[in-house]
Structures are given as C-alpha cells and as structure tokens.
Amino acid sequence: MVCVLIPATSANLGPGFDAVGMALSFYNEVSLGPSPKELEIEVFGDGAELISRDKNNLVYVAITKIFERLGKTPRNLKLTLKNRVPLARGLGSSAAAIVGGLVAANAYLGNPLPKDELLRLATELEGHPDNVAPALLGGVVVSGFDRDKVKYLKLPVPEVEVVVAIPKFQLKTADSRQILPAEIPFSQAVLNVNRVSFLIAAFCLKKYEYLQIGMEDYLHQPYRSQLIPGFYQVVEEAKKAGAYGVALSGSGPTVIALAREGKAVGRAIEETFLNFGVEAEIIYTRPEERGAIDLINYKGEGDC
C-alpha cells in the first residue's frame, strides 16, 4: 500500500490570476492498496457525504489515467481518502484529488513517470496548472502554457504565516467564472501587471512589506468580491491588524492573508466577516515547500 499527502493550494495568488499558486501546510491523504473487490473506496473527513464511491470518483479517475498511460488496467484496488481540504472553497480540492490519484498510482506502480509527466497529466485533467502545480511540486509556483506545453518556475517560499479564512458557504469555480467580464479597461490590466511584478519581487527579495500592494488584484477580485459579503472591509481590517497582504484564494470564497504573525489578523478577519453575517473558519498555517511527490509514505504532520 502507498499513502500520499497532498497540500491544499491557493491559486490566483493576489494579482497572479491563472498564473501563481502556493501550497499550504494542511493536507488531504490518499491511500492506495490491493482489495479482494474490483474497487473499494472509503472517504472520511470534509465533504465525505458529497464524494462518490464509484468509478466517477475524481481520485480514481486520476488513478486510471496513470494505469492507461502505462498500458495497464486498474483491478482489485482499495482507495482510502481522508480530506481536510474543503470542497468548493478556493483551496484546490479538485487539484488535490487529481494530484493525489496520479501520485498514488504512480508510486503504487513503482514510480515509472517523472514529475513533469505527472504535471502534464494533472493539467490535462484539471484544465489549467495553477493549482495542480503547487499541489504536486510544493512551494510557490508560476505556471502557464507555451502553446500546448506546461511551463513552470518555483519561487522562493515566503517566510510568513498564512491566515486562511474559510466562509461557511460554497462557491463553485464555474459559477464564479460567470461573473467575470469578457474585457477589462486597459488601465486596469496595466495596474495588474504592476502589482504582480511587486508580488514576485517581494517574494524573491523577501521584502514582504511590498505585499501591501503586491497582493492587490484588478482582474478578478473586483467582480468575484460581489459574491462575498464584506470582502473589501475584511481586507482593510486585516491590513490594519498587521497583514502584509490579503486576497481571495482561488475563485473564493476563502480569503488568505500573509503576515509575520497571524493571530491578530485572524481575529480581525473573523470579526469583520461576522459583522456581515458570515461565519468563517480560521486556519493558521504556513506555505508548504514540499508537494505530493515529496510526501509519499511520509511520517510527520499527516497520518501516512
């Protein structure tokens, strides 16, 4: 049997829309082993009641992708999923499922495929690399397409605490994409290029105070924030409490803040959301340098 930990991820990091993602230090767990049955799937944890236990399970779909790539047929498998990454909250739950299935199946078969091939397959299943790249590789990853090929670079991992505020309502990516305009003003696009330049420079130079502007976004947050009560008030109060920068995680509704120390920031976010009638779970975590490929049968923070 093999066991893999897959980190949660925050994509669209600040102004890095469809380009920059960061792995976080809390995890889903995928275990794969033999079974006397054709297929046996157990699911525990967040959203377990919503996850299929048949061949439509996304982790299993990813597993079959590896078997097919190697000319094999998956038979007599037991799949156990322990989920901490919440569904449809902007923390890469589908990417975690895809990467977990690919890495577990590859390890189960002796690790014949290299990480770049795993990333290609993950991107093929997910449709874009901005969540699957940090889930697979860890750290902060800039990723995108050069024609039909996935390209990526890893940035220095920021030495910060990450405050993750998860509102207690779902926001599916497909729904939140519908609110995005087909076009934005040229001046808005220029401003976003400026801000993402500050984001990258702040990480590379460890000048985290520049994340005050380096986490600002003008491509998607002005529109998606309409679906999240009190979003901009949350941003302002978090900054007043000491956050370097604040942004939506993925397509939302989760909000992340980067800070030297997170407790005061977390309290400010929680209280501000409550003022708008929104309950939010607050998680204090850090960027995760390791991806799923580094966390096979890992003994540490997870249960593998």
UniProtKB/Swiss-Prot annotation:
GO MF entries: ATP binding; homoserine kinase activity
Subcellular location: Cytoplasm
Catalytic activity line of the entry: L-homoserine + ATP = O-phospho-L-homoserine + ADP + H(+)
Binding site for ATP: P86, L87, A88, R89, G90, L91, G92, S93, S94, A95, A96
GO process annotations (BP): threonine biosynthetic process
Pathway participation: Amino-acid biosynthesis; L-threonine biosynthesis; L-threonine from L-aspartate: step 4/5
Keyword Amino-acid biosynthesis: yes
SUPFAM superfamilies the record matches: GHMP Kinase, C-terminal domain, Ribosomal protein S5 domain 2-like
HAMAP family in alphabetical order: Homoser_kinase
Enzyme class per UniProt: transferase
Family recorded in the similarity comment: Belongs to the GHMP kinase family. Homoserine kinase subfamily.
GO CC aspect terms: cytoplasm
PANTHER family referenced in this protein's UniProt entry, alphabetically: HOMOSERINE KINASE, HOMOSERINE/4-DIPHOSPHOCYTIDYL-2-C-METHYL-D-ERYTHRITOL KINASE
EC number: 2.7.1.39
Lineage: Bacteria, Bacillati, Bacillota, Clostridia, Thermoanaerobacterales
Protein name: Homoserine kinase
Role description: Catalyzes the ATP-dependent phosphorylation of L-homoserine to L-homoserine phosphate.
Keyword set, alphabetical order: Amino-acid biosynthesis, ATP-binding, Cytoplasm, Kinase, Nucleotide-binding, Threonine biosynthesis, Transferase
Hydrolase among keywords: no
